[in-house]
Amino acid sequence: NLMQFELLIMKVAGRSGIVWYSD
C-alpha cells in the first residue's frame, strides 16, 4: 500500500531527525 509506504518514510525520516519528505 502506497499510503503505508509514505508513513514508513515519514517514520524513518522523523527517527533520523531528517525532514526531506514533503508532499
From Swiss-Prot:
GO-annotated cellular components = extracellular region
Q: Which cofactors? A: Ca(2+)
Keywords assigned: Calcium, Disulfide bond, Hemostasis impairing toxin, Hydrolase, Lipid degradation, Lipid metabolism, Metal-binding, Platelet aggregation inhibiting toxin, Secreted, Toxin
The UniProt record lists the EC number as 3.1.1.4
Q: List localization entries.
A: Secreted
| Group of enzyme by EC | hydrolase
Q: Does the keyword Metal-binding apply?
A: yes
Entry PTM? Contains 7 disulfide bonds.
- GO MF term (any one): toxin activity
Cofactor details (free text): Binds 1 Ca(2+) ion.
List the expressing tissues: Expressed by the venom gland.
Where do the TM regions start and end?
Answer: none
Q: Reaction(s) catalyzed by this protein?
A: a 1,2-diacyl-sn-glycero-3-phosphocholine + H2O = a 1-acyl-sn-glycero-3-phosphocholine + a fatty acid + H(+)
The GO biological-process annotations, alphabetized, read as: lipid catabolic process
Its chief place of residence is: secreted
Key word Metal-binding present in the record? yes
The family annotation for this protein states: Belongs to the phospholipase A2 family. Group II subfamily.
What's the stated role of this polypeptide? Snake venom phospholipase A2 (PLA2) that shows a moderate inhibition of ADP-induced human platelet aggregation when tested on platelet rich plasma. Exhibits moderate hydrolytic activities and prefers the anionic micelles (dPPC with deoxycholate) to the zwitterionic micelles (dPPC with Triton X-100). PLA2 catalyzes the calcium-dependent hydrolysis of the 2-acyl groups in 3-sn-phosphoglycerides.
Q: What is this protein called?
A: Acidic phospholipase A2 CTs-A2
Q: Which organism is it from?
A: Trimeresurus stejnegeri (Chinese green tree viper)
